[in-house]
Design a protein with these regions (language model features):
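Long lumenal/extracellular ectodomains of secretory and single-pass membrane proteins
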Residues: 1-318, 328-495
Length: 495
């Protein structure tokens, strides 16, 4: 009876009435499946989800936290990490102290500043001071320095809280405000941060040596103030003569400024892109890291109305950018194709010579309506049944990128979309392709499957790095999570 009660109590419905689950039956897996999709959620909601995971298994929860922040091997989620780290410092400070020295390694030095005013403040300031002294010593010997000075707050900043933090740090370092400021100036000069050049209107720097975020963030300043040299650099990037760093950029960052539902033509969904912007976008997109797959996999992209609800980033931007990226980098038989769905599914073959051409083309198919994922499964099954397609020619895997607020099943509203699709395929002599449910906006606590379902995994976030993780990963939700966080990269992270 207890198991029946648990099963019944775990039932809920999506915003569109589809039967689904409140939880995967693991709080850690619930967090893993959504931690990359919480950017629009409140601090309190983020904390509540982490508290449950931390209570279930502290070590797993801590590894999940650092995986979420990891800008090189994980999801690159900054705000969620800082919210949780601040909560931990106030409630479980020992878990923070054990991992303080790893924060900058997985993220940035300024992530540590969220610990100001917490029981971990003193230890955090000591970590900063130790690195600061190492950098000053290295500077005296004309050596390399860390990026600490780039991220430390300035005492002459315009924001009052930033100034207060800077003064507190200077005091802990044993420096006057003036000495602290001079030290930062010297260290930042050694780092050669591009902001110094822009402030002084000095455009003699080497574009090929600038970090990816800065290159994209300041592209309009380059166009405006150094158009000839910047244009020449972009041409050399396109011919392979120069390298443009884009290793920490996510595809949505190139799509987000230009994709629009409100304020654009309903037929295009695109804002105007200038000729100079086109050159910059095309070169940057071509320079993104390549996460390829050789499997017969196809991405399924949700373009329903809720994907355009106000959020930063817009879920539709994330989904469309990932769909376009994956289709281009897919080396299987579905290369340059993906399925877009809302009221009905559309198989889209990507056309266009450049990124801007291709983005504009695929955006023109957007149908901002309901969330009929059942029709996607029906399209694949009908195509197979009517043409006697053997199992091995079906997609081996479907990567469904969505906010998971699916419509209810038309023929059996009491079944979840996953179970309904599974039953339909089996009734016609087929096995349902493996499914990756990729959440890009977790507004509600609900999950499409539970932890021990076979042939399915749950992921979340904006990074294409997940494509390579799910290619050869264990196709069981809980086992896949463990496979990711038990990687050697997170071995040293403990509670």
């Amino acid at each position: 009876m207890l198991n029946y009660l648990k099963k019944e109590a775990n039932k809920t419905v999506t915003e569109n009435g589809a039967v689904t689950h409140i939880t995967t039956e693991s709080d850690c897996l619930d967090l893993f499946a959504t931690i990359g999709a919480l950017r629009r959620e409140s601090d309190q909601e983020i904390e509540a989800r982490f508290i449950r995971a931390y209570t279930e298994n502290r070590d797993i929860a801590m590894k999940l936290l650092f995986f979420a922040r990891d800008i090189r091997g994980g999801l690159g989620e900054r705000r969620v990490f800082k919210v949780i780290l601040n909560w931990l410092a106030k409630n479980e400070p020992q878990s923070v102290r054990k991992n303080l020295t790893y924060v900058a390694e997985y993220g940035r030095f300024d992530d540590l500043l969220c610990l100001m005013g917490t029981p971990c403040e003193k230890e955090m300031l000591s970590v900063l001071k130790e690195q600061f002294e190492k950098d000053r010593l290295s500077l005296e010997n004309s050596g390399e320095v860390s990026l600490l000075a780039k991220w430390l707050p300035s005492v002459n900043a315009s924001n009052a809280q930033t100034v207060r933090n800077a003064k507190k740090i200077a005091k802990h370092f044993g420096l006057s405000d003036a000495s602290y400021r001079k030290a930062l100036v010297a260290l930042r000069r050694q780092i050669r941060i591009i902001e110094n050049n822009l402030r002084e209107k000095d455009y003699t720097f080497d574009y090929s040596k600038q970090p990816s975020k800065a290159m994209y963030k300041y592209r309009k300043a380059f166009m405006r103030n150094d158009s000839e040299r910047y244009g020449d650099f972009l041409k050399k990037v396109s011919t392979g003569e120069e390298k443009l760093h884009a290793d920490t950029l996510a595809p949505y960052e190139l799509v987000e400024p230009y994709l629009s539902y409100h304020g654009s033509s309903d037929s295009t969904f695109m804002r105007k892109i200038t000729e100079q912007e086109k050159d910059s976008l095309n070169a940057t997109w071509a320079s993104l890291p390549k996460f390829e797959t050789k499997e017969n996999v196809i991405a399924v992209i949700d373009t329903s109305g809720s994907m355009y609800w106000d959020a930063k980033p817009l879920p539709a931007s994330v989904a469309l950018s990932l769909g376009l990226y994956f289709a281009e980098n897919n080396t299987g038989i579905y290369k340059n194709h993906f399925i877009e769905f809302s009221r009905k599914p559309q198989l889209i073959e990507i056309k266009g010579e450049t990124f801007v051409d291709r983005l504009r083309y695929v955006a023109s198919f957007n149908e901002v309506a309901n969330t009929n994922i059942e029709a996607v499964f029906d399209l694949i099954l009908k195509s197979a049944v009517e043409n006697n397609v053997p199992q091995e020619e079906l997609p081996a895997k479907l990567i469904i990128i969505s906010d998971m607020e699916f419509d209810c099943c038309v023929e059996n509203a009491k079944m979840s979309n996953f179970n309904n699709a599974k039953a339909k395929f089996e009734a016609n002599g087929y096995k349902l392709p493996e499914i990756v449910f990729w959440n890009v906006a977790s507004r509600n606590r609900q999950q499409p499957v539970t932890k021990n379902e076979q042939g399915v995994v749950l992921v979340s976030g904006c990074t294409p790095r997940l494509f390579s993780m799910v290619e050869s990963g264990n196709m069981n939700p809980y086992a896949f999570m463990l496979e990711v966080i038990e990687n050697e990269r997170y071995a040293k992270i403990v509670a």
